[in-house]
Amino acid sequence: MRLSDRDIELWIKNKKLVIEPIPNKELIHGVTIDVRLGNEFYTFCNKFNKNIDLSKSRNEISKILKKVMNKKHIIPNDHVFLLKPGMFVLAITLEKIFLPNNLVGWLDGRSSLARLGLMIHATSHRIDPGWGGNIVLEFFNSSNMILSLCPGMLIAAVSFEILSSPSIRPYNIRKNAKYFNQSEVTFSRIDQD
Protein backbone atom coordinates (compact mmCIF):
# COMPACT_ATOMS: atom_id res chain seq x y z
CA MET A 1 0.00 0.00 0.00
CA ARG A 2 1.39 3.40 -1.01
CA LEU A 3 1.52 6.25 1.46
CA SER A 4 -0.87 9.11 0.74
CA ASP A 5 0.17 12.74 1.11
CA ARG A 6 -1.42 12.72 4.58
CA ASP A 7 0.57 9.61 5.55
CA ILE A 8 3.82 11.02 4.13
CA GLU A 9 3.38 14.13 6.29
CA LEU A 10 2.61 11.97 9.35
CA TRP A 11 5.59 9.65 8.80
CA ILE A 12 7.89 12.68 8.46
CA LYS A 13 6.38 14.33 11.56
CA ASN A 14 6.86 11.11 13.58
CA LYS A 15 10.41 10.71 12.19
CA LYS A 16 9.64 7.27 10.72
CA LEU A 17 10.61 8.70 7.33
CA VAL A 18 13.48 11.19 7.42
CA ILE A 19 13.86 13.76 4.68
CA GLU A 20 16.46 16.54 4.97
CA PRO A 21 15.75 19.36 4.63
CA ILE A 22 12.21 18.79 5.91
CA PRO A 23 10.00 19.41 2.88
CA ASN A 24 7.41 22.16 2.62
CA LYS A 25 3.86 20.87 2.29
CA GLU A 26 3.81 22.32 -1.24
CA LEU A 27 6.25 19.56 -2.28
CA ILE A 28 3.92 16.76 -1.10
CA HIS A 29 1.17 15.72 -3.53
CA GLY A 30 -1.28 12.80 -3.66
CA VAL A 31 1.17 9.92 -3.21
CA THR A 32 4.52 11.60 -3.86
CA ILE A 33 7.02 14.09 -2.58
CA ASP A 34 8.85 16.24 -5.11
CA VAL A 35 12.64 16.24 -4.90
CA ARG A 36 14.91 18.94 -6.24
CA LEU A 37 18.14 18.89 -8.18
CA GLY A 38 21.36 19.32 -6.24
CA ASN A 39 24.37 21.20 -7.60
CA GLU A 40 26.78 18.32 -8.28
CA PHE A 41 27.19 16.63 -11.66
CA TYR A 42 29.66 14.07 -13.00
CA THR A 43 30.41 13.70 -16.67
CA PHE A 44 32.34 10.98 -18.43
CA CYS A 45 35.76 11.53 -19.96
CA ASN A 46 35.44 11.68 -23.76
CA LYS A 47 39.10 10.89 -24.46
CA PHE A 48 38.98 7.37 -23.07
CA ASN A 49 38.39 4.19 -25.04
CA LYS A 50 34.67 3.78 -24.43
CA ASN A 51 34.71 0.01 -23.89
CA ILE A 52 34.13 -1.03 -20.29
CA ASP A 53 34.65 -4.78 -20.30
CA LEU A 54 32.51 -6.05 -17.43
CA SER A 55 33.96 -9.56 -17.77
CA LYS A 56 37.32 -8.35 -16.43
CA SER A 57 38.50 -8.72 -12.83
CA ARG A 58 37.28 -6.32 -10.14
CA ASN A 59 40.68 -4.64 -10.07
CA GLU A 60 40.73 -4.11 -13.86
CA ILE A 61 37.17 -2.75 -13.88
CA SER A 62 38.08 -0.39 -11.02
CA LYS A 63 41.03 1.02 -13.01
CA ILE A 64 38.84 1.56 -16.08
CA LEU A 65 36.12 3.29 -14.04
CA LYS A 66 38.66 5.72 -12.56
CA LYS A 67 39.74 6.70 -16.07
CA VAL A 68 36.29 7.16 -17.56
CA MET A 69 34.45 8.87 -14.66
CA ASN A 70 36.52 11.82 -13.70
CA LYS A 71 34.86 15.17 -14.36
CA LYS A 72 33.06 16.68 -11.38
CA HIS A 73 31.08 19.89 -11.88
CA ILE A 74 29.73 21.99 -8.99
CA ILE A 75 27.13 24.39 -10.37
CA PRO A 76 26.29 27.54 -8.37
CA ASN A 77 22.58 27.94 -7.58
CA ASP A 78 22.15 30.82 -10.03
CA HIS A 79 23.80 28.96 -12.95
CA VAL A 80 22.75 26.06 -15.18
CA PHE A 81 24.26 22.77 -16.28
CA LEU A 82 23.89 22.27 -20.04
CA LEU A 83 22.85 18.70 -20.85
CA LYS A 84 23.58 18.21 -24.53
CA PRO A 85 21.67 15.82 -26.81
CA GLY A 86 22.75 12.20 -26.29
CA MET A 87 24.67 13.10 -23.13
CA PHE A 88 24.62 10.84 -20.05
CA VAL A 89 25.61 12.33 -16.68
CA LEU A 90 25.23 11.55 -13.01
CA ALA A 91 23.67 14.16 -10.72
CA ILE A 92 22.30 14.24 -7.19
CA THR A 93 19.16 15.33 -5.37
CA LEU A 94 19.18 18.23 -2.97
CA GLU A 95 17.22 16.17 -0.44
CA LYS A 96 18.57 13.32 1.67
CA ILE A 97 16.09 10.52 2.31
CA PHE A 98 16.35 7.80 4.98
CA LEU A 99 13.90 4.90 4.75
CA PRO A 100 12.92 2.62 7.64
CA ASN A 101 13.06 -1.17 7.24
CA ASN A 102 9.35 -1.44 6.42
CA LEU A 103 9.20 1.06 3.56
CA VAL A 104 10.37 1.01 -0.07
CA GLY A 105 10.65 4.15 -2.18
CA TRP A 106 10.06 4.62 -5.91
CA LEU A 107 11.73 7.42 -7.88
CA ASP A 108 9.91 8.71 -10.93
CA GLY A 109 10.85 11.43 -13.37
CA ARG A 110 8.52 14.33 -13.99
CA SER A 111 6.28 13.96 -17.03
CA SER A 112 6.89 17.57 -18.09
CA LEU A 113 10.65 16.91 -18.24
CA ALA A 114 10.21 13.54 -19.97
CA ARG A 115 8.25 15.33 -22.71
CA LEU A 116 11.38 17.39 -23.34
CA GLY A 117 13.48 14.22 -23.66
CA LEU A 118 15.01 14.15 -20.17
CA MET A 119 15.32 10.71 -18.60
CA ILE A 120 15.91 10.90 -14.84
CA HIS A 121 17.05 7.35 -14.11
CA ALA A 122 18.49 4.69 -16.38
CA THR A 123 17.03 1.66 -14.58
CA SER A 124 17.41 2.10 -10.84
CA HIS A 125 14.26 3.71 -9.54
CA ARG A 126 13.76 1.52 -6.43
CA ILE A 127 14.96 2.88 -3.09
CA ASP A 128 15.49 -0.10 -0.79
CA PRO A 129 14.22 -0.40 2.79
CA GLY A 130 16.95 0.83 5.14
CA TRP A 131 18.63 2.95 2.46
CA GLY A 132 19.62 6.53 3.21
CA GLY A 133 21.38 9.42 1.54
CA ASN A 134 21.10 11.74 -1.43
CA ILE A 135 19.68 10.00 -4.48
CA VAL A 136 22.04 9.80 -7.45
CA LEU A 137 20.22 10.55 -10.68
CA GLU A 138 21.22 9.03 -14.03
CA PHE A 139 20.35 11.70 -16.60
CA PHE A 140 20.11 11.07 -20.31
CA ASN A 141 19.07 13.68 -22.85
CA SER A 142 17.21 11.78 -25.56
CA SER A 143 16.12 14.95 -27.37
CA ASN A 144 17.88 16.97 -30.05
CA MET A 145 17.88 20.09 -27.81
CA ILE A 146 20.27 21.26 -25.12
CA LEU A 147 18.48 21.14 -21.76
CA SER A 148 19.48 23.71 -19.12
CA LEU A 149 19.27 22.19 -15.64
CA CYS A 150 19.30 24.51 -12.64
CA PRO A 151 20.17 23.45 -9.07
CA GLY A 152 17.06 23.60 -6.91
CA MET A 153 14.61 22.90 -9.74
CA LEU A 154 11.95 20.22 -9.26
CA ILE A 155 13.46 17.14 -10.90
CA ALA A 156 11.62 14.01 -9.75
CA ALA A 157 9.03 12.60 -7.36
CA VAL A 158 9.35 9.82 -4.79
CA SER A 159 6.49 7.62 -3.61
CA PHE A 160 6.61 5.23 -0.66
CA GLU A 161 5.11 1.79 -0.23
CA ILE A 162 4.66 -0.08 3.05
CA LEU A 163 6.04 -3.63 3.03
CA SER A 164 3.97 -6.59 4.23
CA SER A 165 6.52 -6.94 7.06
CA PRO A 166 9.82 -5.21 7.93
CA SER A 167 12.79 -6.34 5.87
CA ILE A 168 15.17 -8.68 7.72
CA ARG A 169 18.02 -7.66 5.39
CA PRO A 170 17.58 -3.91 4.92
CA TYR A 171 20.10 -2.01 2.85
CA ASN A 172 21.85 -0.35 5.80
CA ILE A 173 23.00 -3.66 7.35
CA ARG A 174 24.29 -5.35 4.19
CA LYS A 175 28.01 -6.03 4.02
CA ASN A 176 28.06 -4.65 0.49
CA ALA A 177 25.88 -1.56 1.02
CA LYS A 178 27.85 0.29 -1.65
CA TYR A 179 25.69 3.38 -1.84
CA PHE A 180 24.46 3.80 1.75
CA ASN A 181 24.64 7.31 3.19
CA GLN A 182 25.99 8.81 -0.04
CA SER A 183 26.15 12.59 0.15
CA GLU A 184 27.72 13.24 -3.24
CA VAL A 185 27.51 11.78 -6.71
CA THR A 186 28.79 8.22 -6.40
CA PHE A 187 30.22 6.43 -9.43
CA SER A 188 29.26 2.91 -10.38
CA ARG A 189 30.74 0.49 -7.88
CA ILE A 190 30.16 -2.55 -10.05
CA ASP A 191 33.78 -3.47 -9.35
CA GLN A 192 32.68 -4.25 -5.77
CA ASP A 193 30.11 -6.89 -6.80
Swiss-Prot record:
The active site is at E138. Keywords: Hydrolase, Nucleotide metabolism, Nucleotide-binding. Pfam families: DCD. It catalyses: dCTP + H2O + H(+) = dUTP + NH4(+). The keyword Kinase does not apply. Its EC number is 3.5.4.13. DCTP binds at R110, S111, S112, L113, A114, R115, D128, V136, L137, E138, Y171, K178, Q182. Gene3D superfamilies: 2.70.40.10. GO terms for biological process: dUMP biosynthetic process; dUTP biosynthetic process; nucleobase-containing small molecule interconversion. Pathway: Pyrimidine metabolism; dUMP biosynthesis; dUMP from dCTP (dUTP route): step 1/2. InterPro entries: dCTP_deaminase, dUTPase-like_sf, dUTPase_trimeric. One of its GO terms (molecular function) is dCTP deaminase activity. It is an enzyme of class 3 (hydrolase). Belongs to the dCTP deaminase family. Homotrimer. NCBIfam families: dCTP_deam. Catalyzes the deamination of dCTP to dUTP. This is dCTP deaminase. It comes from Buchnera aphidicola subsp. Baizongia pistaciae (strain Bp). The lineage of its organism: Bacteria, Pseudomonadati, Pseudomonadota, Gammaproteobacteria, Enterobacterales.
